[in-house]
Amino acid sequence: MAGTLQFDIVSPERRLASFAATEVQVPGTDGDMTAMEGHAPTITTLRPGILRAHGPSGVQAYAVTGGFAEINATSISVLAEKAVAVEELTGTVLDEFIAEARELASVALPEDRDMAERTLNDMLALKASSGH
């Protein structure tokens, strides 16, 4: 498949996917971005959202709670704090993500509170957009 980059997504529990992708849409902390073959080397943090990888069997989508993505001209490696394939995503899973984010926001130090509240708001938006 011409014009591809190697896509890998892992969480602490397991490897979720590894395949050649034509593009990967990433929910970056500083804004969404699309990685394609030839991308400039970049490391970005992830915010809660949906990551979409366009591969040989169509679009594979994953809900991520945060993490990092390392992108270069030939590959993208995503190290997700938590990740679930969208087809496995349920209201219960989202509620667990939200409860954890809410707890972290409630105990965050003053200098970390803005980021914790932003993460909670991103989780709530993820649930609202998912239809669960």
Swiss-Prot record:
Main location: membrane
Subcellular locations according to the entry: Cell inner membrane
Keywords: ATP synthesis, Cell inner membrane, Cell membrane, CF(1), Hydrogen ion transport, Ion transport, Membrane, Transport
Assigned GO CC terms: plasma membrane; proton-transporting ATP synthase complex
SUPFAM superfamilies the record matches: Epsilon subunit of F1F0-ATP synthase N-terminal domain (SSF51344)
GO molecular function terms listed in the Swiss-Prot or TrEMBL record: ATP binding; proton-transporting ATP synthase activity, rotational mechanism
Topological category with respect to the lipid bilayer: Peripheral membrane protein
Pfam families listed in its UniProt record: ATP-synt_DE_N
Transmembrane segments: none
NCBIfam families: ATP_synt_epsi, PRK13443.1
PANTHER family: ATP SYNTHASE DELTA/EPSILON CHAIN, ATP SYNTHASE EPSILON CHAIN, CHLOROPLASTIC
HAMAP family: ATP_synth_epsil_bac
Oligomeric and partner information: F-type ATPases have 2 components, CF(1) - the catalytic core - and CF(0) - the membrane proton channel. CF(1) has five subunits: alpha(3), beta(3), gamma(1), delta(1), epsilon(1). CF(0) has three main subunits: a, b and c.
Function, as annotated: Produces ATP from ADP in the presence of a proton gradient across the membrane.
Family the UniProt entry places it in: Belongs to the ATPase epsilon chain family.
Record protein name field: ATP synthase epsilon chain 1
Source species of the chain: Cereibacter sphaeroides (strain ATCC 17023 / DSM 158 / JCM 6121 / CCUG 31486 / LMG 2827 / NBRC 12203 / NCIMB 8253 / ATH 2.4.1.) (Rhodobacter sphaeroides)
Protein's gene: atpC1
